[in-house]
Amino acid sequence: MTTQNNNNRIDYIEFPAAGIAATVKFYTAVFGWKFTDYGPDYTSFEDGRISGGFAKVPAIPGNGALIVIYSSDLEKTQAAVVRSGGKITKAPFVFPGGRRFHFTDPNGNELSVWSEK
């Protein structure tokens, strides 16, 4: 993931995956993506332009990919989401590389915001 020079831009796309090993095998064979594993439940990829990841889930949800936006000030962005009518669906939590929270916009789309701080 990138940092401050991309403040408030889409930075990362996260997909749900039923199985990490099969997912890595598929995307490596088809598109040549490079992967970095973070344990049995998560892997990240680089395709040369954008980065993303696959998170193991018990069932693939109907909402598909998770768009992740970078913010240099997580708390300020979280407050703006709530103030503007969004709903926090996952409170800020720590993950390898920083912290993030999830929210739904007024249309019900789920997104996430991350910061290295």
Could you tell me what each predicted segment is?
Residues 1-4, 46-50, 76:
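Amphipathic alpha-helical "stalk" segments
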Residues 1-24, 65-67, 117:
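N-terminal beta-strand motif that seeds the catalytic metal site of vicinal oxygen chelate
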Residues 27:
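Catalytic core of tubulin tyrosine ligase-like
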Residues 30-35, 85-87:
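Conserved acetyl-CoA-binding loop of GNAT-fold acetyltransferases
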Residues 33-64, 110-115:
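Conserved short beta-strand elements that form part of the metal-binding/catalytic scaffold
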Residues 69-110:
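Vicinal oxygen chelate
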Residues 96, 116-117:
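A short acidic/small-residue loop/turn micro-motif
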